[in-house]
């Protein structure tokens, strides 16, 4: 090892300076490590085994989604807008379609509203199972990776039957959905959802009562109710800290007001509670899907016919939905053109990322993965 000591302001590379710190403090770069382009970096300062400072460094997968939307019309924006969260594509398109429908004064057919809700909840389960599987890797629990990755195929299969695509569906469009569901879909959907729910019940013994998960997540990264509200967290992170807030209940859209389900809330605020809320939410998704299948009109139109390149008025709208990670909103500014003048995407991942330094400071370094992924953070969505 070189014995050379650099002065505090010594420039090693353009824009890179070495900072003189206490001899006890070590700076660690966690990431970006990914077989693709790299997702995120977390800069940690540790004193022995304890984290004394955390500096998240997002932006490695920024693709300019908001700017891109200004150069495409309201319909051709759909395929690229779902890319930031490919495993929850229906829910990221949902607020966009609701906003454009408000701009254009469109009334969505009743049958399409129910099908949207079904697709949204199927996608929520697909995303949550993927998130849970990755959490298993973070915790060193291989079964927790394999089971969710296998069980999510039940929901992917249903979405494939509905939309013709396994992952990114481009299924929601302003004015309804792209196409109706196939014949006998209701029976297949009900059968697979019921089996999926039975599988979820087995997770309690194998995962949530498992000493591995409990020892890694209980009493780590505790976020109080007051701090959860103050930091602006959302979704499972907020509800794991005792705040009863779900947009499907508080600001219902389409036919969620008619659905029979409850909001899951826990008070512990630790990583264990944050890992459990999404699992409990999947049971409610199954309830919603069954209820929507029962109440859905058996026939009717599923899409409003639009003129090519429809134009909005000189106005602006904001619509938000409850995605698999929390509140996801779209702010659309229209100036009477076929494309948005401005599109701003408010994503839950970035809001929950704000809590990371608060939770990791003072924690042991070994607890970092468990706390980080419990925040339901999706790097690609945060960067947009």
Tell what function each PLM region has.
Residues 1-342, 346-384:
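Active-site bordering "gate/hinge" segments
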């Amino acid at each position: 090892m070189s014995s050379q000591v650099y002065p505090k302001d010594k420039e090693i590379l353009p824009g890179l300076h070495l900072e003189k710190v206490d001899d006890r403090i070590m700076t660690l770069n966690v990431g970006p490590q990914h077989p693709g382009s790299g997702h995120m970096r977390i800069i940690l300062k540790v004193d022995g085994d304890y984290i004394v400072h955390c500096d998240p460094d997002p932006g490695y997968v920024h693709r300019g989604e908001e700017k891109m939307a200004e150069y495409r019309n309201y319909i051709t924006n759909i395929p690229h807008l779902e890319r930031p969260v490919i495993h929850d594509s229906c829910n990221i398109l949902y607020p966009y379609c609701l906003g454009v429908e408000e701009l254009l004064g469109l009334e969505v057919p009743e049958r399409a509203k129910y099908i949207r809700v079904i697709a949204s909840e199927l996608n929520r389960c697909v995303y949550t199972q993927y998130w849970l599987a990755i959490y298993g890797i973070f915790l060193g629990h291989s079964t927790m990776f394999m089971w969710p990755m296998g069980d999510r195929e039940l929901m992917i299969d249903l979405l494939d039957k509905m939309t013709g695509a396994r992952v990114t569906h481009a299924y929601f469009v302003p004015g309804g959905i792209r196409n109706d569901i196939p014949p006998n879909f209701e029976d297949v959907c009900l059968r697979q959802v019921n089996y999926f729910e039975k599988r979820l019940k087995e997770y309690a013994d194998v995962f949530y009562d498992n000493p591995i998960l409990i020892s890694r997540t209980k009493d780590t990264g505790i976020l109080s109710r007051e701090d959860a509200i103050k930091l602006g967290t959302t979704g499972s992170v907020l509800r794991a800290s005792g705040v009863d807030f779900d947009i499907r209940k508080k600001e219902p859209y389409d036919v969620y007001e008619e659905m029979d389900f409850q909001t899951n809330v826990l008070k512990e605020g630790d990583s264990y509670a944050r890992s459990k809320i999404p699992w409990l939410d999947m049971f409610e998704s199954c309830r919603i899907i069954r209820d929507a299948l029962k109440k859905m009109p058996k026939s009717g139109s599923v899409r409003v016919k639009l003129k090519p390149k429809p134009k909005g008025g000189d106005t602006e709208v904001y619509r938000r939905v409850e995605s698999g990670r929390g509140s996801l909103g779209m702010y659309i500014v229209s100036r009477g053109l076929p494309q948005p003048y401005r599109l701003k995407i408010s994503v839950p991942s970035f809001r929950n990322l704000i809590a990371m330094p608060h939770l990791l400071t003072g924690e042991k370094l070994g607890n970092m993965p468990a706390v980080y992924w419990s925040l339901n953070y999706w790097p690609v969505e945060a960067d947009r």
